[in-house]
């Protein structure tokens, strides 16, 4: 996948794995990451909660996140969605046809009306996620099910894209069209304005710094300058 992304000279992709210290995602590495692509499967529970929170903070600050296939059950995706992220599924190597439902979206640039993947795992509705900002792709499967397979979100200052294809026993990520979607998605998710760490702060503004003169009235729980409860 990194090789497919690096085929675009505007992208410089490296890899991080579960087995590495801090899963290859220490603070220093995330601070230099514009977009994180996340694929996970049976070891979702092995991902350290502190790393999940670290990634969530970076997304809120403006780092892009692309979640692939079975990553719908990853801790980070469920953390950002706030829903169970459940769905129907079937492993049968059936054909998947992905229809472009938002042809003017940057992620769909150069894709055409639809594209097909000959062998894939079926995902079917209901997909228990929040209503997305945009639905870029809808999948039809040979067995008759349909699925919202390309969804965009914004969490804090970060752009998030969920892309359905990518079962581990099929060569999906070697498909040229899938690779193009991933490169498009990385470019879309990249926040050109840079990180916004101020989104994580909740400043206690004193009366004397109000924009208009005011007189303090009533009781309060907090002392001047106190950070407050979270």
Residue spans for each PLM region:
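Catalytic beta-strand/loop cores that center a nucleophilic Ser/Cys/Thr
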Residues: 3-14, 32, 87-162
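Helical hinge/lid and interdomain linker segments adjacent to catalytic or ligand-binding clefts
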Residues: 1-74
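Stable alpha-helical elements in mature extracytoplasmic
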Residues: 1, 29, 51, 77, ...
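N-terminal accessory segments
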Residues: 208-230
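Extracellular ligand-binding/catalytic regions of CAZymes and related secreted enzymes
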Residues: 7, 145-147, 154-209
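Solvent-exposed loop/turn segments at secondary-structure junctions
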Residues: 20-23, 41-45, 71-75, 113-114, ...
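Hydrophobic/aromatic beta-strand patches that form the interior of the parallel beta-sheet core
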Residues: 37, 66, 134-136, 161-163, ...
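A glycine-rich, often tryptophan-bearing local segment used as a flexible ligand/cofactor-contacting loop or short
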Residues: 43-113
